[in-house]
Regions:
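Mixed-charge interfacial surface used for oligomerization/domain docking
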Residues: 3, 9-23, 27-28, 91, ...
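Glycine-rich phosphate- or other oxyanion-binding loops that anchor nucleotides, phosphorylated ligands
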Residues: 55-56, 62-93, 97-98, 143
Length: 276
């Protein structure tokens, strides 16, 4: 049996994780010096509502390698022969390192994989291989599909402000300050572990139009999730406005606080897998 592990930055809804037997390790947010588990100790809605008024900026932290080791041990006790542990890019997070440190205790029975993606750009990779694993597919078949989905996954988002990116140190203070004064709506894409700038728009309305254009350019899609940070109405309106062929069972997801801490509330975007 091949077991699948990921972490909460994958944004896989609980019901899908349960359906496809995916084990998810929660990540950590530090609020006023107190560590809380993403999606467990505080809801995402509450977190994003509080974020603009927090006097001290919250920080993100990686779950300990001990949490991963405990998860791996439980899965082996339940009969797993091999574990695939799929995580956010090592260049963006310490999650990959924590999982890798834990995996050393189990030799080649645990494979830790850099997805090159975040949120459901990673989550769709995990879901694809979890379905195959339940069907009893071979490790080689599963790894081949994982690489295929990885190459076709895209995550693009419009931020409502540069303020939270500036706090995180992802851009220079001057650039973030100017962007905030001009009310720019920056666009970013995550691909192969890199965060790429796709420019900006002056207004949210134009930004949503541009986001739609970026999605259309990708062509036929296999999977689609509309991502937001406490902007569910905008996310659902965006989904309903699409005139392209929308894949079956699209998701609308309020993304992980670990990512949203650095992007801020009212963000809007999408994760997709381009049809092969």
């Amino acid at each position: 049996m091949i077991a699948i592990v990921t972490d909460s930055t994958s944004d896989i809804p609980d019901q899908l994780a349960e359906q496809f037997q995916i084990s998810i390790v929660p990540n950590v947010i530090v609020i006023d010096g107190q560590s809380v588990l993403d999606g467990k100790d505080i809801s995402r809605e509450e977190y994003y509502n509080r974020l603009p008024t927090m006097k001290v900026s919250p920080t993100t932290a990686t779950s300990s390698s001990g949490m991963y080791q405990e998860m791996y041990e439980k899965l082996f006790e339940k009969g797993a022969e091999t574990i695939l542990s799929i995580h956010a890019p090592r260049v963006l997070s310490g999650i990959f390192g924590a999982a890798s440190a834990a995996a050393q205790a189990f030799g080649d029975r645990v494979r830790v994989i850099d997805s090159g993606q975040i949120t459901l750009g990673m989550g769709y990779q995990v879901l694809a291989v979890a379905q195959l694993a339940l069907q009893g597919a071979s490790l080689d078949t599963i790894l081949a599909l994982l690489e295929s989905v990885r190459q076709r996954a895209r995550v693009i988002a419009m931020l409502d402000t540069l303020e939270y990116v500036q706090r995180s140190g992802r851009v220079s203070w001057a650039r973030a300050r100017i962007g905030t004064l001009l009310h720019l709506k920056p666009f970013v894409e995550v691909r192969d572990g890199q965060v790429l700038s796709l420019g900006e728009t002056r207004t949210r309305r134009r930004g949503i139009e541009h986001l739609r254009e970026l999605l259309y350019r990708l062509g036929p899609l296999e999977r689609l999730a509309i991502l937001h940070t406490n902007a569910e109405d905008d996310a659902r309106q965006f989904l309903s406005s699409l005139t392209m062929d929308v894949p079956p069972d699209p998701l609308v997801v309020n993304i992980t606080t670990v990512i949203g801490t650095h992007t801020g509330p009212n963000g809007l975007g999408f994760a997709t897998v381009i049809r092969a």
